[in-house]
């Protein structure tokens, strides 16, 4: 469940230093007349003895959709002497207006006005921190860069400093087919849900119809910007790290798709900073899987006490970066726990990381340069066993054994390691290539081959080769001429034991993570000194006595909920041996729940189907179907959407259908079709 609170080893805290008063709905007026809806958790007596505030600012509906996860965190902060403020962004939940896109200027301007509003409340000291995961982690960084005087510190989880390089739209300059349409279809149907009549009154239906009519499918704008132009630079704080002057605590997980930015921010931010990377998926570390979970809320309090209450907690005396260095494990599609150890670094890049190079030889990785050339295999269904780009910790999220994938790509394997090899940082693949076409892609997988023969994916990367020199100014791939590229793989912390082997695999195809080129390409690798795998070889110098242990995970009590339908997930790969079509069918039923506190019922199902036919890259297609329900008693609404994406030699074609029902009556049913030229993609 993306927005459920999973069972975990955490403790539940029911008594706090402060009693908490809760206001479910309060309006925050914007200067243009639009009102945003907020929920408040305020320590009792704060109007006499004001307290600092913690803001979470999201498009995900506080009344029901994030209510469970909000219930374990915001009361916890409030119980420790903070006003906790949860705001539905413009056009979402009970808030008025329209959400037109991710991370738009309007979103950031509204956040500044929310900070103004908090500062004027009689319970507020005027010091505010922002916390958020994913979208809330993104906008925390973006608002920090705007330097509002009330914002004193942020905690950003599962986010990025570079919207083009590390998000669900493009990766390595190639369209991220597995996620771009899925996320656009997700936000299309999420945004289509109505405000709660209990809070907004009889205007809910008029507001709902306006929201349905005016909220665009975000994918259209994303597809208009296939290169790293000004659209993506907006909201990418890497454009000017110096704009962020307040303290930043950046948190990521190895199982997540948003970990790379932690290293970049620790390297480039000039102000106070800390980085934390655990084994976790796209979730808060006190409940995330794979474990071990940590007392993250206590860690947050140390941060907030340091910067919002100006109390010395010792948190800044500890090393700037703390990382869970993972042990080798057999490949599985889900893990409850990833064994490993915490390591500490005082800076990044670290002097404890040195480059270790392997060269490509005949199906081997060698310490000496190879000879000759090798044409890469082209199998359009290579990549089906890669797992998902952004795991939330559901069953089926993680990559399968890579044995099948290795047979569909050119795989090079080292001799058995004579001693343990720890890697921490960004692996890189430098390759000298020859191409038969002006358009070509390259996917690189790094795996751990165990003595038993299992192959576990450690990291991966992909590159649209027209972007080899610049994501902003792509250029044709030279045909029939040698050229050199470097593919940076995702950052990783992993220990390969003695006796294991390093594997690297190359392919011009990686479906569905990488949308295929319009025609099959013959890509040849030149096996000489310029073609090599470069690993960040890590020496652990951390002394156990240096490590300040995290406290046991604990939260406030999760609010009461009734399960009306259980959740479930299936992820299947099918092959039609007559047509040679391959289908990846990913279905998630997030169940249906009722919240007795407000009577709201909500549920959803999502099915994503990725199709491709061997030998025909133009057969690639994606279809994403959603059904969402939200209601109370006789008031029931239902949203249904179907989004599709396909391409020919010249264009991408996208269709977005949205259907809304009140009870059994269809009140809205519209399909939008969109096409755009392929821009070096």
Regions found by a protein language model. Give the residues of each.
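Accessory cap/linker subdomain of secreted extracellular hydrolases
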Residues: 70-71, 79, 145-243
